[in-house]
Structure formats: structure tokens, C-alpha cells
Regions:
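Short linear Ser/Thr-Pro motifs
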Residues: 6, 28, 62, 116-117, ...
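Conserved beta-strand-loop-beta-strand hairpin that lines the nucleotide-binding pocket
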Residues: 14-23, 68-162
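STAS-typified acidic loop motif
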Residues: 23-35
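Conserved short strand/loop->alpha-helix "switch" segment adjacent to the catalytic nucleotide/phosphoryl-transfer site
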Residues: 37-62
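Conserved polar catalytic motif of the HATPase_c/GHKL fold
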Residues: 63-67
Length: 162
């Protein structure tokens, strides 16, 4: 008989083993964007993703972290928090990128392709569009003066090869 089940812990243990989380906090420096991407990719490896799935997730994270640096903190120093959650049973990867920067006044407008708050920096305004394209779900929560939280999900192993 199972060790955990014999102690009445079978279901509790299974539920606990279903999830794995990782949280990173780093400064809003350009060099940390690649650190965030690579850290998330290494964590995602537990789900045995394809090369394409890893590339998609890394691209979406890169866009979210860059948005926090450029738009959230207006290139000033600040903290970015990235939390990754794996549902090992359903093979779902979720990442939350959060800043405490200036926030977004109109999220709906900000998510329109080609919209940017920094045209002088030659920003393309495609960050949210890329996040939507590479992930299955995207949710953006923001409030001016409080910062922005970007939550993205991707099911691993269900997307056809290109």
C-alpha cells in the first residue's frame, strides 16, 4: 500500500505535487530581461515542451518584462516580480509579470496593435499583440499609480507543429 495513502495523506500529497511555483524579483535593468526569459524556460522544462513552445513562452515573457521596464518605470529603476506556476497534471504554464510603476490608464487602448506611450523611443506598440499571439490566455490588470500585472497562460503539448 502507498506510504502516503496509509497515513491518510494520499489525496493531499497528490494535490500538493500537482503544482510547482517559482517567484523571482529583479531590478528593471535591460540585462535582467534575458535572465527572466531563461529562468522561465528552465522552469518550464519540467513539462517537456517543444523548442517552439519554449521560444513562444520566452518571447511573451520578454515582451511583458520589457513593457514593465519601458512603460511601467519609464526607464527608471524599479522592481519587477515574475511568478511562474506549473500545473503538472494539466500541463499548463502560467506566468505573472508585475511592476509597481506608473500603471496603464486605458488597458483596452494599450492593447491595440501599434499603440505606444513612447513613440519617441521608436517603440512598435506590438508587445501585447505578441503576448496574445504566443500564449493561450492574456489578462492585463492595471491602475494608474499602482502598476501593472500581466498574467499569461499556455497549455503545453497541444499546439500543432508549424
Amino acid at each position: 500500500r502507498d506510504y502516503y495513502a496509509s497515513r491518510g495523506l494520499g489525496d493531499v500529497y497528490k494535490r500538493q505535487m500537482r503544482w510547482n511555483t517559482m517567484t523571482l524579483e529583479f531590478e528593471s535593468r535591460p540585462c535582467n530581461e534575458s535572465f527572466a526569459r531563461v529562468s522561465a524556460a528552465a522552469f518550464l522544462a519540467q513539462l517537456n515542451p517543444t523548442v517552439e513552445e519554449v521560444a513562444d513562452v520566452k518571447t511573451a515573457i520578454s515582451e511583458a518584462v520589457t513593457n514593465a521596464m519601458i512603460h511601467g518605470y519609464r526607464q527608471e529603476k524599479g522592481k519587477i516580480q515574475m511568478k511562474c506556476v506549473l500545473d503538472l497534471e494539466e500541463k499548463v504554464f502560467q506566468v505573472t509579470v508585475k511592476d509597481t510603476g506608473v500603471g496603464i490608464e486605458n488597458v483596452e487602448k494599450a492593447m491595440e496593435p501599434m499603440f505606444t506611450t513612447c513613440p519617441e523611443l521608436e517603440r512598435s506598440g506590438m508587445g501585447f499583440s505578441f503576448m496574445e499571439a504566443f500564449m493561450d490566455e492574456l489578462e492585463v490588470r492595471s491602475h494608474p499609480g499602482w502598476g501593472t500585472e500581466v498574467v499569461m497562460k499556455r497549455k503545453i503539448g497541444v499546439h500543432p507543429e508549424m
